Amino acid sequence: MNIPLSDRLLACAEFVNPGDRIADIGCDHGYLSIHLLTNGIARSAIASDVAEGPLQSAMHNARKFGVADKMSFYLSDGAKNIPRDFDALVCAGMGADTMIHILEDAPWLRSKQYYLVLQCQSKTPMLRRYLSDTGWHIADERIVKDGKFLYTVMKIRWQPDAPKLTAGQCYISPAMLTRGDPELAEYYQRITDGLRLAVTHQADPEKKAILEELESLEL
């Protein structure tokens, strides 16, 4: 049976280290965990959601695909009510505000015991700024095209001594430049076009400085 995964979620799966235990926050139908288990990537999965409906759907799908014995299910607002015996925490399909709320409510995640895989839907520069300011390091970040939209998936680790991101790096991270995905040029164009539009329609010295920083990059 095929597991219906979007390109976004497939990109998240690629950032999970083989043999690790995962916690999928906001699991929806549970397909990411099921994909990781049926393909022998993860050895166990915690699936959590803030709503009962998606959690019941995830439980049904786990039984359908024969991995219910490797999964546990929790009704939880973010990571509040889940056990802590995992290696990787995955948050996908949420905006920056929600992700920041989840991280603020779980300060115990600030440990080298864990790494996080985040796929942010909106306000990604704000999320990068928050991560940098609170001791998280973006170890890897890739661009993924899903339909007509471009998203990024980042793998982050607790590293309080990591260099802080500049304002421009909150729009295009050093990890993205290092990876050099084929979609980078298009992503860069969309970001700089949006900044130019903002600068044209309103006198915003902060955005103007960010645009100048990004325009100085050699892609």
Where would I find each of the regions flagged by the language model?
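Glycine-rich SAM-binding Motif I of class I
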Residues: 30, 34
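Conserved alpha-helix/loop element of class I SAM-dependent methyltransferases that forms part
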Residues: 3-19
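C-terminal substrate-binding/active-site "lid" region of AdoMet-derived donor-dependent transferases
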Residues: 105-155
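Conserved SAM-binding motif I beta-strand of class I
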Residues: 44-49
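An accessory alpha-helical subdomain
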Residues: 160, 164-219
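Conserved SAM/SAH-binding beta-strand->alpha-helix loop
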Residues: 51-53
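Conserved class I S-adenosyl-L-methionine
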Residues: 19-28
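S-adenosyl-L-methionine
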Residues: 56-84
